[in-house]
Design a protein with these regions (language model features):
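Active-site nucleophile elbow and catalytic-triad environment of alpha/beta-hydrolase enzymes
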Residues: 173-193, 203
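Flexible "cap/lid" loop of the alpha/beta hydrolase fold
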Residues: 107-156, 179-182
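Conserved loop-alpha-helix segment in the C-terminal half of the alpha/beta-hydrolase fold
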Residues: 203-229, 240, 248
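Conserved HGGG/HGGXW glycine-rich cap/lid loop of the alpha/beta-hydrolase fold
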Residues: 27-69
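Short beta-strand/loop motif that positions the catalytic acidic residue
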Residues: 199-201
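Bacterial N-terminal signal peptides
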Residues: 8-17
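Gly/Ala-rich beta-loop-alpha elbow adjacent to hydrolase catalytic centers
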Residues: 90-95, 99
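Conserved acidic catalytic loop of the alpha/beta-hydrolase fold
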Residues: 71-87
Length: 256
């Protein structure tokens, strides 16, 4: 009899403890995984990383090789694999192509697109841009050894045109060029069809036309806001970008 009571007590204790652990896990802040775009690198998120870490978030900034969409998705997947709980993926520009596919991982609870590509299944950057208004970006691109760089003038005039000369020089020096083939890499099934999605349109964007951004945001049925910013909004408007990320991370609509 005493043995039976002990077992019942032990089981009840374990049930309570397990429930408490589950509740604790559910209440934990998601890990924020940043995915940069072409002509940037993981350091472009420095402002947001520092602010989020100060608020108790775990943060990972992916370093994409931009050799192919598959390579970048694999790089992002390795970052997701490091995380035990929920993940919010934040993609800028080309990074949107990456999170659209990597976001299918079950750990990913939400997606944040910042002036980013949001392809449908089978779409490439070239395809989704084909019928959109064009910018002057192409005249500032510099091919070299099978990769595409952006010129110093391009950084100043269309990519990071709202930043100080010192910041622009840093952006130019730290850029990650893209393999010339990535613009035709096709996306797989998009995660935005299944996951809560946020989109920030850069109203002053001279790299991706704002109307194309609006089209993609509407197609995703994303919660959308517009920011009077150039393409690299995480550098030109760090506080506003941080606010959107925190909104996504604290949303009650995150995928469980």
């Amino acid at each position: 009899m005493k043995t039976s009571k002990f077992i019942v007590t032990l089981l009840l204790t374990l049930m309570v403890a397990t429930g408490a652990m589950a509740q604790s896990t559910d209440n934990e802040k998601p890990t924020i995984v940043f995915v940069h775009g072409i002509w940037a690198d993981g350091s472009c998120w420095t402002n947001q990383i520092a602010a989020l870490q100060a608020k108790g978030y775990h943060v990972i900034s992916v370093q994409n090789p931009i050799t192919s969409l598959a390579d970048d998705v694999a790089t992002t997947q390795r970052a997701i694999d490091l995380v035990k709980g929920k993940v919010i993926l934040v993609g800028h520009s080309w990074g949107g192509m990456v999170i659209t596919q990597a976001g299918n991982d079950p750990k990913v609870a939400g997606l944040v697109y910042l002036a980013a590509y949001g392809p449908d299944s089978g779409e490439s950057v070239s395809a989704v841009s084909a019928n959109a208004p064009q910018t002057e970006l192409s005249k500032y691109l510099v091919p070299s050894g099978g990769y595409v760089f952006i010129s110093e003038e391009g950084v100043k005039n269309v990519f990071a045109n709202e930043l100080s000369p010192k910041q622009q020089a840093l952006v130019y020096a730290t850029q990650t060029p893209a393999s010339h083939t990535v613009f035709d890499d096709k996306s797989g099934e998009p995660a935005w069809k299944q996951k809560p999605t946020w989109y920030v349109v850069a109203k002053n964007d001279k790299t991706i036309h704002p109307d194309l951004e609006r089209f993609m945001a509407k197609r995703m049925n994303a919660k959308t806001m517009e920011l009077a910013s150039c393409h690299v909004m995480m550098l030109s408007h760090p506080a506003e970008v941080l606010k959107v990320i925190e909104e996504a991370a604290s949303s009650k609509n995150l995928k469980r």
